[in-house]
Swiss-Prot record:
Free-text note regarding domains: Synaptogenic effects are mediated by the extracellular LRR region.
Protein name listed in UniProt: Leucine-rich repeat transmembrane neuronal protein 2
Key words of the record: Cell membrane, Glycoprotein, Leucine-rich repeat, Membrane, Postsynaptic cell membrane, Repeat, Signal, Synapse, Transmembrane, Transmembrane helix
Subunit relationships: Interacts with DLG4. Interacts with neurexin NRXN1; interaction is mediated by heparan sulfate glycan modification on neurexin.
Lineage: Eukaryota, Metazoa, Chordata, Craniata, Vertebrata
Gene Ontology terms describing biological process: long-term synaptic potentiation; negative regulation of receptor internalization; positive regulation of synapse assembly; regulation of postsynaptic density assembly; synapse organization
LRR repeat residue numbers: 63-83, 86-107, 110-131, 134-155, 158-179, 182-203, 206-227, 230-251, 254-275, 278-299
Length: 516
């Protein structure tokens, strides 16, 4: 009976003892052993700025996160983190790491984030990241990498973000990203890239944002981006690009933003933007453009924001296509687009110069009150919500102002047709003048014959006077030479000439004619 009554009391005791033993076994896994100089929060260990020269050995093997930022670690040995199989993120940025041995991250199968930025890494073995099959974010920016092994990122099929900013990369190996099928963000900015391989981005079928700014690219062939079927944003600013081409006909329907600011672009293939039917933001400030063909502008049908300031715009007849397009543009531009040449237009807004100097032939402008211009307190530029974008001025308008200005511009395209039309117009004017003169003469003869007879009689009288004067002069000369002996004019008017051949009597008549 005694044993029967003790058993119910002993069962809870046995359960408590078993639970206590399990807790004791799980203490290491729960992160109770915190390394010296580190701050521990549950299973996350923060050992930043503690002067570590190597990874501390006392780190708990069950930790999920380890931060060793801002220390003095110079080298990562082979199997350095092999026993930390539970790590999901590892931060090693802002150290002095220059050497990473092969398989240094072996065993970190659950690692999702690895930060190695701001170190001195100049080389990475091709097996460095092989076993990081769950890695999603890799940051290698601000190092000294000059080249990458073609198989360096092999096996990283879950990688979504890759930072390679501010290294010394000169080329991108073909098929470097072939196995990165999930990559959505790639930053290759601030390197020394001079050209892009045709298949350099093969495999990046999910890439949405690509950064190539601050490199040394001189020419861009958009056919090299053919395999980036999901790309949304492309940054190419501050390179040395002089022209844009497209080596083949294709449609890049996903691209919505293209930044080409700060290059040396002088020429653009007429069909480049036809491959980007959904492009919404195009920034080409601070280049060397002096004009844009109307075919290029007409292909920008979906554009909502454009940047064209800081170029070498020539405000002559060549600017009419751009002025016409700007006049009907429904979107916005953040900075003024000013003339660069000739001298008398330098510094003038393009649209102001076109109107003020009458640069475009047959220009017509209609101004109506339709839209509202206001100052956005969160931005530096003035938004214009209107049916056109004619620049009225750079005066600051209060947020309460309700000034509404809209212009409708019509600019013909400057081409050979204008010259031909002018020649035809001039020829027609000359022909009209000629026929008009003939018509006036004909009418005069039909309508005013007395006047014409008087004019004719006056002309005949004048001719007779001239003839008589010449006859007198001739006779005077002949009398001095010998045939004439005597000349005696009478008081009545007739005169007699006596010579060796006979006698001639000439009497002056009232109508001034002479009979012999």
């Amino acid at each position: 009976m005694g044993l029967h009554f003790k058993w119910p009391l002993g069962a809870p005791m046995l359960a408590a003892i078993y639970a206590m033993s399990m807790v004791l076994k799980m203490l290491p896994a729960l992160g109770m052993a915190c390394p010296p100089k580190c701050r521990c929060e549950k299973l996350l260990f923060y050992c930043d700025s503690q002067g570590f020269h190597s990874v501390p050995n006392a780190t708990d093997k069950g930790s999920l996160g380890l931060s060793l930022r801002h220390n003095h670690i110079t080298e990562l040995e082979r199997d350095q983190f092999a026993s930390f199989s539970q790590l999901t993120w590892l931060h090693l940025d802002h150290n002095q790491i220059s050497t990473v041995k092969e398989d240094a991250f072996q065993g970190l199968y659950k690692l999702k984030e690895l930060i190695l930025s701001s170190n001195k890494i100049f080389y990475l073995p091709n097996t460095t990241f092989t076993q990081l099959i769950n890695l999603q974010n890799l940051d290698l920016s601000f190092n000294q990498l000059s080249s990458l092994h073609p198989e360096l990122f092999y096996g990283l099929r879950k990688l979504q973000t890759l930072h390679l900013r501010s290294n010394s990369l000169r080329t991108i190996p073909v098929r470097l990203f072939w196995d990165c099928r999930s990559l959505e963000f790639l930053d290759l900015s601030t390197n020394r890239l001079r050209s892009l391989a045709r298949n350099g981005f093969a495999g990046l079928i999910k890439l949405r944002e690509l950064h190539l700014e601050h490199n040394q690219l001189t020419k861009i062939n958009f056919a090299h981006f053919l395999r980036l079927s999901s790309l949304h944003t492309l940054f190419l600013q501050w390179n040395k690009i002089s022209n844009l081409t497209c080596g083949m006909e294709w449609t890049w329907g996903t691209l919505e933003k293209l930044d080409l600011t700060g290059n040396e672009i002088k020429a653009i293939d007429l069909t480049v933007f036809e491959t980007m039917p959904n492009l919404k933001i195009l920034l080409m400030d601070n280049n060397k453009l002096n004009s844009l063909d109307s075919k290029i502008l007409n292909s920008l049908r979906s554009l909502t924001t454009v940047g064209l300031s800081g170029n070498l715009w020539e405000c002559s007849a060549r600017i009419c296509a751009l002025a016409s397009w700007l006049g009907s543009f429904q979107g916005r531009w953040e900075h003024s687009i000013l003339c660069h040449s000739p001298d008398h237009t330098q510094g003038e807004d393009i649209l102001d110069a076109v109107h003020g100097f009458q640069l475009c032939w047959n220009l017509s402008t209609t101004v109506t009150v339709m839209a509202t211009t206001y100052r956005d307190p969160t931005t530096e530029y003035t938004k214009r919500i209107s049916s056109s974008s004619y620049h009225v001025g750079d005066k600051e308008i209060p947020t309460t102002a309700g000034i509404a200005v809209t212009t409708e511009e019509h600019f013909p395209e400057p081409d050979n047709a204008i010259f031909t039309q002018r020649v035809i117009t001039g020829t027609m004017a000359l022909l009209f003048s000629f026929f008009f003169i003939i018509f006036i003469v004909f009418i005069s003869r039909k309508c005013c014959p007395p006047t014409l007879r008087r004019i004719r009689q006056c002309s005949m009288v004048q001719n007779h006077r001239q003839l008589r004067s010449q006859t007198r002069l001739h006779m005077s000369n002949m009398s001095d030479q010998g045939p004439y002996n005597e000349y005696e004019p009478t008081h009545e008017g007739p005169f007699i000439i006596i010579n060796g051949y006979g006698q001639c009597k000439c009497q002056q008549l009232p109508y001034k004619e002479c009979e012999v």
